[in-house]
């Protein structure tokens, strides 16, 4: 199914997120994950992979692409399943805002503090939260290895004030304290191939990876075309036509 079900649409509207089980098939996960491991672990010590630290000193590796090309990463970001899902939920013509890999290595991957994606996309020149992300689990993702956590329904708050702390952009503490009192805190366990689809104003975070397992996730974020940044604040996120490809095309790409 390329578009959300009625239940998924309702969950997105009310809860700000839903999980689509088996979004990628097992062969697709293996193909994409094995390629990613080979390429990105080779790049880990180069300037093309960033390190994002947390307050304890642990670091998560991050690879960000500015454009979606014809390689395996770009082709998955252009896959019709992600594009049609995003278009249906946003309700407007969309384009790919960014795509990135977050890599929490065993015993090393750091935490991400509570934030809203729109908390910093707004500062990049996007006026409205007509944006979402699709987070695809490439490994088993659970509480032990730093799965995503959400405050269920918190997207209804709109954009909250954020502050810069320890190299991260986090929700200002008084607002966070009030939000955690009001909304249910959910740990989102995921199997490889599952996809978490979430609103740009949903409060979310993840803990450090304290396990002996990898916890990698591929994140594609989409924006309404009319909501493209009004200023070129970053190399990524600016409007480019999304050239959608058939489902699974990435498996034939290098």
Predicted regions and their residues:
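Non-heme Fe(II)-dependent double-stranded beta-helix
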Residues: 1-15, 21-114, 119-124, 163, ...
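Short, solvent-exposed loop/turn segments at secondary-structure junctions
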Residues: 25-26, 102-104, 119, 141, ...
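Double-stranded beta-helix
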Residues: 141-203
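Non-heme Fe(II)/2-oxoglutarate
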Residues: 42, 46-55, 195-197, 201-254
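Short glycine/proline-enriched turns and hinge-like loops at secondary-structure junctions
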Residues: 113, 125-126, 209-214
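Glycine-rich, charged/polar anion/phosphate-binding loops
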Residues: 118-121, 135-136, 182-184, 202-205
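Short, conserved beta-strand element in jelly-roll/cupin
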Residues: 89, 115, 122-143, 189-192, ...
């Amino acid at each position: 199914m390329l578009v959300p079900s009625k239940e998924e649409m309702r969950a997105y509207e009310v809860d700000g997120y839903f999980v689509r089980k088996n979004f990628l098939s097992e062969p697709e996960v293996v193909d994409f994950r094995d390629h990613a491991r080979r390429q990105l672990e080779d790049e880990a010590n180069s300037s093309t992979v960033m390190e994002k630290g947390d307050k304890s000193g642990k670091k998560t590796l991050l690879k960000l692409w500015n454009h979606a090309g014809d390689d395996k990463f770009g082709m998955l970001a252009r896959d019709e399943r992600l594009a049609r899902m995003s278009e249906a939920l946003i309700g407007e013509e969309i384009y790919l805002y960014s795509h990135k890999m977050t890599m929490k290595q065993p015993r090393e991957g750091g935490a991400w503090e509570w934030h809203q994606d729109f908390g910093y996309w707004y500062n990049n020149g996007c006026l409205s939260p007509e944006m979402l992300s699709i987070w695809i689990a490439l490994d088993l993702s659970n509480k032990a290895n730093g799965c995503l956590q959400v405050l269920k329904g918190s997207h209804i708050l709109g954009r909250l004030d954020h502050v810069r702390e320890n190299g991260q952009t986090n929700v200002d503490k008084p607002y966070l304290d009030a939000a955690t009192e009001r909304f249910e805190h959910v740990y989102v366990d995921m199997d490889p191939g599952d996809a978490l689809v979430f609103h740009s104003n949903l409060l979310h975070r993840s803990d450090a990876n304290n396990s002996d397992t990898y916890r990698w996730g591929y994140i594609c974020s989409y924006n309404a075309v009319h909501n493209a940044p009004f200023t070129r604040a970053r190399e990524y996120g600016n409007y480019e036509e999304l050239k959608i490809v058939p489902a699974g095309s990435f498996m034939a790409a290098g």
